[in-house]
């Protein structure tokens, strides 16, 4: 089966989550991704949050499928030589080290260009070079805090909150992926590679653009009418936290369903659409609200929007969340059950679509991983297990022209 990136070679000089999520997607698209790891230890996530002693952790296996792994010590002369040979043959190199780390290894962007002018160099950092935080070590929640997500997440009477979704890590990897694919297309026109940099702060901010929209509206108006604070609360000079309110001008809220007392996920998300208000009233048994001036328009409803949701909840609390969604969908009401990760892991439709995939790795055995989120009509990514540490070292070195004796000598010299 032909794949989009067949014939593209990627050097994966990344660790933890932001970089590996990007390179894993490149591998799913058919690129030959060679993960370069520290001899004897590898990516730190091989060891973090283990569920089986002395076996690669799920943290690693779920972010590194379809890759090849080599152990390489770039601090040695032989290791540097191997690295230069790899760069000479590669199309893309991706790194997410702390600022300056790869330069200290001797692989500055300028030197990489000298070795291979066609190479595309993808780099993830916490912040842009012009940022006052450029030297701050950035992880998931650091990026969420600096990118605008934390200040606008949570309830108005509580502290900022970070999202459980990987807005700082995997989201940054997906943004870099887009940049790398664009750079590949650009290389077809120019014949030259380029550097693609992606800051975690920028990736989070790109998902918070509606909040930047709201900031500008707040600066001009002094209020935001779709937020729960309007019209009875107060607004400061920055976009407030809105709890579970919808952010697109359509009121929404989390509502209890049957069993909420013992099931922490017995809830649905319910959205009120202006154009669907009549159907909403019929669905919840309040047909009189259709023509009542206190309810008939979005502007009229906002002052008592929580009373409206409380009334809707009187119905949803009597039935199972799945029954509630099935019923409300008949009235074209945007809604969804709050699904736990347990439910998602067992969902047959997600298995059927390839969104959740079972793979098998030597030593670990079978495990679940997230599959490719994009569905293509011309090809289906074949999701494979993550590599064992150094599993492909010999094969990759042989491809570079090294003999068995030379490989053995490099191992003796701790270069691999």
From Swiss-Prot:
EC number: 2.8.3.16
SUPFAM superfamilies attached to this UniProt entry: CoA-transferase family III (CaiB/BaiF)
Residues engaged in binding substrate: 248-250
GO biological process, one term: oxalate catabolic process
Superkingdom assignment: Bacteria
Pathway: Metabolic intermediate degradation; oxalate degradation; CO(2) and formate from oxalate: step 1/2
A Pfam family reported for this protein in Swiss-Prot or TrEMBL: CoA_transf_3
Gene Ontology molecular-function annotations: formyl-CoA transferase activity
Chain segments annotated as coiled-coil in the UniProt record: none
Similarity remark: Belongs to the CoA-transferase III family. Frc subfamily.
Reported function: Involved in the catabolism of oxalate and in the adapatation to low pH via the induction of the oxalate-dependent acid tolerance response (ATR). Catalyzes the transfer of the CoA moiety from formyl-CoA to oxalate.
NCBIfam families in UniProt: oxalate_frc, PRK05398.1
Name assigned to this protein: Formyl-CoA:oxalate CoA-transferase
Organism: Escherichia coli O81 (strain ED1a)
Organism ancestry: Bacteria, Pseudomonadati, Pseudomonadota, Gammaproteobacteria, Enterobacterales
Gene responsible for this protein: frc
